[in-house]
A protein has these predicted regions:
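Core catalytic lobe of class I
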Residues: 1-260, 268, 276, 283-284
């Protein structure tokens, strides 16, 4: 049975209690700049990097060498232009020792409507992937997708080029051999995730879809691994981790979120044990 640990407090302090190299995957969506003022106080864009660096330093310490850190974040428009705090944060984290391995896009299929004089509404958010080393655990087959109807037509009549490796004309070293995919019904996904926002807790300000952490948990962990969300909010990441038989740690500064997550994650029919120690809860 997966174990869920709920820690109440500021993650800057709570992360210090976790052992070195003890976490396999970190998936989180911290407060964006000037956002969640009623729940987390809001962090000004100019102060965001300085605010997050102590947190990312602790995350670097507790992540296993083979582990992955997924950071959901987005820019904020200030005085008519996008602030650069996200780009500055990436550079600062690289200076800390992180490898910025990949950037994925969360396409929000049901984003909020709106109109601005110099831009369109945001329909995407960044999913930044950081690692401690170039070789890390990654199970790509776990997130493969159905090839769909396109394969029935595209792969029906193959050209000569399709039957040999199609080397890039620009000499990039990338190429493809379409013939290899004729008998396959699965394909590797792109780095764009098309997911609608959702939130079972309407009082929580971050609409984090369950499918998002699920995708990364399947991709980067196996049952029994440890998943961490240092800004757990309503506990979406923890719910998914438990369903997928991964141990999970959730941290939040608000007691209300801790209590709600505890009430949801504890199954009275199975008489799960609850341990309370100085405001810290362990659900096993």
């Amino acid at each position: 049975m997966a174990r869920i640990h709920l820690l109440h407090g500021d993650c800057k302090q709570e992360l210090r209690n976790l052992a070195d190299a003890s976490v396999d995957l970190i998936v989180t969506s911290p407060p964006y700049a000037d956002q969640r003022k009623h729940t987390y106080g809001g962090v000004p864009p100019d102060e965001y990097v300085a605010w997050f660096q102590p947190i990312s330093a602790e995350l670097l310490r507790i992540l296993k060498p083979s582990g992955t850190f997924i950071l959901n974040i987005k820019e904020r428009v200030v005085n008519g232009e996008r602030h650069t705090y996200v780009l500055e944060l990436i550079l600062a984290m690289r200076a800390q020792g992180w490898l910025w391995t990949e950037e994925l896009v969360w396409h929000k299929k049901n984003c909020y409507p709106g109109k601005w004089p110099n831009r369109f509404r945001d329909a995407w958010e960044r999913l930044l992937q950081f690692n401690k080393q170039k070789k890390f655990k990654m199970l790509q087959e776990e997130v493969m997708i159905n090839t769909g109807d396109w394969a029935k037509t595209r792969l029906r009549n193959l050209s000569i080029t399709d039957k040999v490796r199609d080397e890039s004309r620009v000499g990039s070293g990338f190429g493809k051999k379409i013939e290899n995919w004729v008998s396959r019904d699965k394909a590797y996904p792109t780095n764009v995730l098309h997911l609608a926002t959702e939130c079972s807790n309407r009082d929580h300000s971050a609409a984090f879809p369950e499918a998002l952490p699920e995708w990364f948990i399947k991709l980067f962990t196996v049952p029994g691994d440890v998943v961490l969300d240092p800004f757990m909010g309503s506990g979406t990441t923890l719910r998914v981790a438990r369903r997928l038989q991964r141990d999970a740690i959730g941290i939040d500064i608000h007691q209300d979120y801790i209590d709600r997550a505890r009430a949801e994650l504890v199954d009275p029919e199975r008489q799960l044990a609850l341990l309370q120690d100085r405001g810290k809860y362990v659900v096993s």
